[in-house]
Amino acid sequence: PEHYAAVVRELYGEQADEVLRLYPGETPEQVEQSATDLAGDRFLVYSTWKWADEHRKAGCPVYRYYYAHPRPPMVPEMDGAVAGLAGGVIRNSDAAAQVIAMPPAKGAVHSADIEYAMGNLATNRVYAWTAEDEQVSALMQGYYANFIKTGDPNGPGLPTWPRLGEGAEEQYMVWDVHPHVRVERNRARYEFHDRFYQNLSSPA
């Protein structure tokens, strides 16, 4: 926890206390989760949220999702290979080094949704795809096809996906074997980074 707090203070200076409130690190378990959340927000999540929020403000139809379905294990023929950070496969001695360097992924990794959305599972012989994987892929393709055709992903046989900005609370779809809508609880984190990056770009 002390090292985590020190890194946060180095990165954020006078705003570190607010960061530590939004991403607390009182225990090792909390540090692991908060450091993961903070790194993800800095790398990808905040910018994706900002992009979606600006389109929403402009009146565009925006439908946000969180992809939560992890890939299945690799087929036995892959013989100890490991998945790359954002796609691809690492084999043999390089794979052993990768396993040591990286902890096991929790949930779905970045880029894992692509082959599901494109319906390409059968062409990827690395993983032992299951009926549940096919189910998730069909769900995503249904939403994508509807959005391309009509600007609205909803359609017969699909769980209702609320448009961003509908209702009193911000909502998004969680894509998994059992898709469901979740209320956004992290907006304060994104709004903090919005202010932080605007201050960085403002003239002194």
Task: For the regions a language model picked out, list residue spans one by one.
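A short alpha-helix capping/helix-coil boundary motif
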Residues: 28-31, 121, 176-180, 188
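Mature extracytoplasmic/periplasmic domains
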Residues: 154-182
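Substrate-gating cap/lid region and adjacent catalytic-acid/histidine neighborhood
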Residues: 1-132, 143, 150
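A structural signal for short secondary-structure junctions
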Residues: 108-109, 138, 165-167
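Residues in flexible loops and secondary-structure boundaries
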Residues: 73, 122-126, 156, 169, ...
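Tryptophan-rich aromatic "cage" segments
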Residues: 88-95, 100, 177-204
